[in-house]
Amino acid sequence: MFYAHFVLSKRGPLAKIWLAAHWDKKLTKAHVFECNLESSVESIISPKVKMALRTSGHLLLGVVRIYHRKAKYLLADCNEAFIKIKMAFRPGVVDLPEENREAAYNAITLPEEFHDFDQPLPDLDDIDVAQQFSLNQSRVEEITMREEVGNISILQENDFGDFGMDDREIMREGSAFEDDDMLVSTTTSNLLLESEQSTSNLNEKINHLEYEDQYKDDNFGEGNDGGILDDKLISNNDGGIFDDPPALSEAGVMLPEQPAHDDMDEDDNVSMGGPDSPDSVDPVEPMPTMTDQTTLVPNEEEAFALEPIDITVKETKAKRKRKLIVDSVKELDSKTIRAQLSDYSDIVTTLDLAPPTKKLMMWKETGGVEKLFSLPAQPLWNNRLLKLFTRCLTPLVPEDLRKRRKGGEADNLDEFLKEFENPEVPREDQQQQHQQRDVIDEPIIEEPSRLQESVMEASRTNIDESAMPPPPPQGVKRKAGQIDPEPVMPPQQVEQMEIPPVELPPEEPPNICQLIPELELLPEKEKEKEKEKEDDEEEEDEDASGGDQDQEERRWNKRTQQMLHGLQRALAKTGAESISLLELCRNTNRKQAAAKFYSFLVLKKQQAIELTQEEPYSDIIATPGPRFHII
């Protein structure tokens, strides 16, 4: 941890500083004044227990915060004292006598003012209502499309039949213009009409009124039932070229009847015209004469009546109601809480401590099955040595077994594996015998450059090894001895017979390991084989039941003890000072050789023998140790 427990304790010397660094709001004004910064800084500089740099940094932050708050409180007290002093010693303030301690009534009472409630209300004309409403009103030209209003075709003479329609006769129908003016004023707004008006239009309107007064009682145009104008202008039947919606007829129906014009035709209600006031007069533009203009009269009038635009209300998305989710389980049982408190599996892991020493760490790294079967017992950093070691680990399959495997002579896999794992295969015996012959031939090739004594010694050893009788008949070993030819031995024996015999003492040979007589060790080997079988059975039982220490003691008591006694008898009889493991393991299978090698290691551990090896993969020489004759 980067902090010490004494820092976090409530009564510790740095408790308030630690609290100020991590929870500043928890400190009160009393805590700030009680904190002694000098002692705290000294305890941070020279702490009783070693603190991490991170802890000291946090404590310095707490010191700075406490100092800041102390300075702030001091400044506030100074300001308050300054204000009080300033208020107490104001210039010109005199202490009041006892008579004037009570203030006057007029000084502390507000005067009562009664206003006149009979005042007239302000004039409504003073309030500019239009200005208030025009703030949010757009200009007509900006929001309205300009439309070209055509001329009234009925005002032009078209010489239709004998019905002479001159200007004076048409102007008698002044009521038609008046009614049409009412229609336009009631259905459309004056804002949609152009404001520019010429003086000629006003004069023309005055002439219309004069003609109407003169010929009011003329009754011209009565009895025109079924007339051309009546059929074309008043009829509401469909089929017109520009007859879209009947908006004009509806507006004409809604107009009230006027009693001043009782003698007027039905055309007066539908005919067009301008309003009475000059403000609403429609400016008429001259248009060229067109054919069949009578059918276009109602359609042109419809251009004035714009259809009302639907008010588009902005649709707002309805807020989706929140669905209230209520838990089915509202309370936790005490059993559930206890189970959660007792369950600490997520914060606890298995304890995996590293070995205390480097040697144990190295053993742990290289003690696995993968490393034991792929690397030697000692660290080899050279790649060549590792290749040599791995080359010895690869088994050589005999050729006859390969042929049998390819030819399918093996009955099943178990038989093939048994034959492959059998250490007494002729192939291995032949290889061992070839190695023996190589060992025998090497000194013979180098003999001419040595003295005669060395030649005699080598010949003696060769004679002893060649004269060694074969081991007792045991299956394949006897056959291997018969099959093994020895073409080199007869010439060696001939050369040895020609050399004069020289008597040599047994102590003089340089390599006494080769003088170990195999005849004396044969009965011991047979006994060892029988005992090894018994030991194997006992070891299997011990693996299932006993401990490791008991197994090691039993192995030492039986197999290793027999090896030690055999070595003692061999060295006593031959007088040799050392024994070769390679010579001791001749004519044995792999299991027996491994057992002897293991016995050598146990004896070396018990200081019964000393082992020496000149180079890797060379022969191991055993010499008596300090406890060779004691055990």
Curated annotation (Swiss-Prot):
Its post-translational modification remark reads:
Cleaved by separase/ESPL1 at the onset of anaphase; this cleavage is required for sister chromatid separation and cytokinesis. Cleaved by caspase-3/CASP3 or caspase-7/CASP7 at the beginning of apoptosis.
A GO BP entry is:
chromosome segregation
Mind giving the lineage of the organism this protein is from? Eukaryota, Metazoa, Chordata, Craniata, Vertebrata
Modified-residue entries (Phosphoserine), positions: S46, S153, S175, S249, S454, S545
Q: Where is this region: Interaction with WAPL and PDS5B?
A: 287-403
Give the top-rank taxon of the lineage listed in the UniProt record for this protein.
Answer: Eukaryota
Q: Which PANTHER family match?
A: DOUBLE-STRAND-BREAK REPAIR PROTEIN RAD21 HOMOLOG, SCC1 / RAD21 FAMILY MEMBER
The disorder this protein is implicated in is: Cornelia de Lange syndrome 4 with or without midline brain defects: A form of Cornelia de Lange syndrome, a clinically heterogeneous developmental disorder associated with malformations affecting multiple systems. It is characterized by facial dysmorphisms, abnormal hands and feet, growth delay, cognitive retardation, hirsutism, gastroesophageal dysfunction and cardiac, ophthalmologic and genitourinary anomalies. Mungan syndrome: An autosomal recessive disease characterized by visceral neuromyopathy, intestinal dysmotility and chronic intestinal pseudoobstruction, megaduodenum, long-segment Barrett esophagus, and a variety of cardiac valve or septal defects such as membranous ventricular septal defect, pulmonary and tricuspid valve regurgitation.
According to UniProt, the tissues expressing it are described as:
Expressed in the gut (at protein level).
Q: Show which residues form the site (Cleavage).
A: R172, E173, D279, S280, R450, L451
Gene Ontology cellular-component annotations: chromatin; chromosome; chromosome, centromeric region; cohesin complex; condensed nuclear chromosome; cytosol; meiotic cohesin complex; membrane
**Annotated region (Interaction with STAG1), positions in chain:** 362-403
Q: What is this protein called?
A: Double-strand-break repair protein rad21 homolog
Gene Ontology molecular function: any one: lncRNA binding
Q: What is known of its domains?
A: The C-terminal part associates with the ATPase head of SMC1A, while the N-terminal part binds to the ATPase head of SMC3.
